[in-house]
Amino acid sequence: MNIFKLLGGGKLKADYIRYKSLRRCGFAKLFLAYPEFRYQFYYRLREHSNLWKILLKPLQLGNSHNLYLNSDDIEGGLFIEHGFSTIIACRHIGANCWINQQVTIGYSDATNCPYIGNNVHIKAGAKVIGNVRIGDDVIIGANAVVVNDVPSHSIVVGVPARIIKVRSHISDPWRSIVSIQVE
């Protein structure tokens, strides 16, 4: 029996593979040494079954790193680097996203939540606010404030964020290397 299916499905496995490849260590060290991985692990368990939601409810609040993770749909392969003071509250986060510290992904009200595509890298201190859609393969620069939609393959920086470059997979082949595919 596959332990990942029992505990949280393919998304948990994709998260583990992503962390393992970037941190170069096994599950025990990831779980004990990296609170971001541990918190994400608990999130996946809560997502997987109502029993886990009840058992892990006390762990939902009071995280020492102030990592708040709340989304209706987070695909596998999410990597949170230094989750200190990071708030993630959105409709969707695509596969293989990378979020750095002090990032805020939030809503202007309960119905206007961000949608984050696949292979998005959100650098330290960036803010993604309101009913915005971030396309696939986007890089959001450090301390950028995104309040408008960002098309796929873009790099955005500044306050408010503006596109400084539109890339292609031909000019940036590394994106296909870091993507993780899990059945």
Question: What kind of feature is each model-predicted range?
Answer:
Residues 1-64, 171-183:
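Terminal amphipathic alpha-helical/low-complexity segments used for targeting or macromolecular assembly
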Residues 61-164, 168-169:
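Structural signal for interior beta-strand "rungs" in well-ordered beta-sheet cores
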